[in-house]
Amino acid sequence: VTMVTLGLDTSNYTTSAAVFDGADGVNAGRLLEVRPGQLGLRQSEALFQHVKALPGRMAELAESGVLRDVAAVAASARPRAVEGSYMPCFLAGESQGRALAAALGVPFFAVSHQQGHLAAAAWSAGRMELLDAPFLAWHLSGGTTELLYVQPEGANVKAGRIGGTADISAGQLIDRTGVLLGLDFPAGRALDALAAGAEKGPKRFKVKMDGLEFSLSGMENQVRALAAGGVEPAAVARFALDTVSDVVRRTTEEARKRYPGLPVLCSGGVASNSGLRQMLTASCGALFAEPRYSTDNAMGVAILAHRLLERGE
């Protein structure tokens, strides 16, 4: 009998449920509804939408015929596996996960949203073995721009932040640039498409770095100034994306001097940006999660459930 595990992830942006059988998996996800012009949701509203959306995600999995012989359930219970990391929206997935596990008489595992991202990224990059030795990982998303040092911890992973932004995240810069240019939130994909139409953006802004830390708020002011100065939207988009790619590349190169020989794995919505991928692949052979497993998903959570169950943890 194939051992199937179920993962649930109820983040700030997406309601997801996924199953994994040890090799392959299916993820059913749906973005939360954000009103046009708004930058995200309050926690109470996100939690309410998740509670309403989860049965639909489960039904999707059931209809595709993959939801049987579930041997364990896992859910993202918090953003990161560190003391004091908490967000009410994860309660939706965790409580339904615990209830399902109890009803099925199978183990329940609580993992972090970040651990799920790392597992999904490694699996979708075709490099699941990364999870069994130290590596460097960029998490580039709407809420975080972090460079992590990741090492195995039993069947799961332990991630420590070694660099990234001191203020707004790359995703926030991209979303704010997009909304400023009249695009919908979240704006990553649309901004990427818009930037592709630019002959050439204004000369990229060289973001100051302090070791492996950098700040993007000054960059946001530059974007506002360009847009207000009548620079065409495609060029502004290109400028924002090129600048982000450049500082991520420089930080990665600096990190590789400090941690020689470690592979670099990139995930998070911003990691699906085409320019960034080209730049990092060329500069350090970085590995990338598949775009659909780069954004929030429950796949990594289901993968971790499988690993934890298999190794009897």
Report the location of each language-model feature:
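Glycine-rich beta-strand-to-loop/alpha-helix junction loops that act as flexible
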Residues: A75-R78, S141, L265-N273
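Glycine-rich phosphate-binding/hydrolytic loop that grips phosphoryl groups
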Residues: H117-A121, E290-E313
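Short glycine-rich, Thr/Ser-proximal phosphate-binding strand/loop in the N-terminal lobe
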Residues: T10-F48, N156-R161
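Conserved phosphate-binding catalytic cores of ATP/NTP-utilizing and phosphoryl-transfer enzymes
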Residues: V106-L136, L304
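A short helix-loop
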Residues: T10-S11, N27, E129-A133, H139-S141, ...
